[in-house]
């Protein structure tokens, strides 16, 4: 019986989505999946509902390699309001404390410099980090505070894009696991005041930029062929790894769980992108230097990679 619903299809590739404000990352993902009628989809790192910007969405076989984008460096543009602390660290919470807001540019610059480099950061309660199987934000909404350990992160740069206290806009380049809400609070703490985020936009991840992204509205106005043309190939997610070309027999060995011979001047356990002699992406294999072999890590489905 025909229900009238569009039939799901095997879509493989990466969509650079510009997530709008007010949607959770999962809601944005599901909207994109429905637009493409894709059987399978996943994203590569959560953005808060308040936040906008770059959210790479993986369809089909690309989901096998999504984890490698989670470890990537990222860039954000954050808007801060100085002098006010929020219960959530952003504009969605209630103002719970106030302090001086007449901050000078020199004070703000000094604080930004102090928070640049390899630093320790305590994750916020309003985060998706798990404690006993539940995300921290579920505890936070009940008023329960869980002790969190500080983690090492790297803030490569904090550039001040705009400053007119109590408003400040900063461009941040940082490592994975950096919470910009917490960074903003820590900048203010260094000055002796409070701050919370009023806007946050992810502008870059793993070398992809917001200029390459597409809004849900723009995607909805395209036909299927036009939308599909915007998808990036699955191997863009692992383009930072070295690559090699194998003959058909060696590729067959990988798919059969065997380990073809391979010799390269690479550290042991290095992930290697594998391609066939005609340029087809096979997947990732691990270089086992001590025995000069390649071990399959994550391989494309043969039907999908041949498409």
From Swiss-Prot:
Enzyme class: isomerase
Listed Gene3D superfamilies: Pseudouridine synthase (3.30.2350.10), PUA domain (2.30.130.10)
Active site, per annotation: 48
Coiled coil: none
MF term (GO), any: pseudouridine synthase activity
Entry's EC annotation: 5.4.99.25
Keywords associated with the record: Isomerase, tRNA processing
One Pfam match: TruB-C_2
Gene Ontology biological-process entries: mRNA pseudouridine synthesis; tRNA modification; tRNA pseudouridine synthesis
Catalytic activity: uridine(55) in tRNA = pseudouridine(55) in tRNA
InterPro entries: PsdUridine_synth_cat_dom_sf, PsdUridine_synth_N, PUA-like_sf, PUA_sf, tRNA_psdUridine_synth_TruB, tRNA_sdUridine_synth_fam1_C, TruB_C
Keyword Lipid biosynthesis: no
Entry similarity comment: Belongs to the pseudouridine synthase TruB family. Type 1 subfamily.
PANTHER family in alphabetical order: PSEUDOURIDYLATE SYNTHASE TRUB1, TRNA-PSEUDOURIDINE SYNTHASE
Task of the protein: Responsible for synthesis of pseudouridine from uracil-55 in the psi GC loop of transfer RNAs.
Record's protein name: tRNA pseudouridine synthase B
Organism: Neisseria meningitidis serogroup B (strain ATCC BAA-335 / MC58)
Gene name of the record: truB
């Amino acid at each position: 019986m025909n229900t009238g619903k569009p039939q799901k299809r095997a879509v493989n590739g990466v969509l650079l989505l510009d997530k709008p404000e007010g949607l959770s990352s999962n809601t944005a993902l599901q909207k994109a999946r429905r637009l493409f009628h894709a059987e399978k989809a996943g994203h590569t790192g959560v953005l808060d509902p308040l936040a906008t910007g770059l959210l790479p969405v993986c369809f089909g076989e690309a989901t096998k390699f999504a984890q490698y984008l989670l470890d990537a460096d990222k860039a954000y543009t954050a808007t801060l309001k100085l002098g006010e602390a929020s219960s959530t660290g952003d504009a969605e919470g209630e103002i719970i404390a106030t302090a001086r807001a007449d901050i000078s540019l020199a004070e703000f610059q000094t604080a930004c410099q102090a928070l640049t480099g390899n630093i320790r950061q305590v994750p916020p309660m309003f985060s998706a980090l798990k404690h006993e199987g539940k995300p921290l934000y579920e505890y936070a909404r009940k008023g329960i505070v869980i002790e969190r350990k500080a983690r090492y992160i790297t803030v490569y740069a904090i550039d001040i894009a705009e400053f007119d206290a109590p408003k400040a806009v900063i461009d941040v380049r940082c490592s994975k696991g950096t919470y910009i809400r917490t960074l903003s609070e820590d900048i203010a703490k260094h000055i002796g005041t409070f701050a919370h985020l009023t806007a946050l936009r992810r502008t870059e991840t793993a070398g992809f930029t917001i200029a390459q992204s597409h809004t849900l509205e723009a995607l909805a106005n395209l036909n299927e062929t036009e939308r599909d043309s915007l998808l990036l190939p699955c191997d863009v997610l692992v383009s930072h790894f070295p690559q090699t070309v194998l003959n058909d027999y060696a590729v067959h060995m990988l798919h059969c769980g065997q380990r073809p011979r391979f010799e390269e001047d690479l550290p042991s356990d290095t992930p290697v992108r594998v391609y066939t002699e005609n340029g087809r992406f096979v997947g990732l294999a691990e270089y086992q230097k001590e025995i000069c072999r390649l071990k399959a890590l994550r391989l494309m489905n043969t039907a999908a990679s041949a498409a």
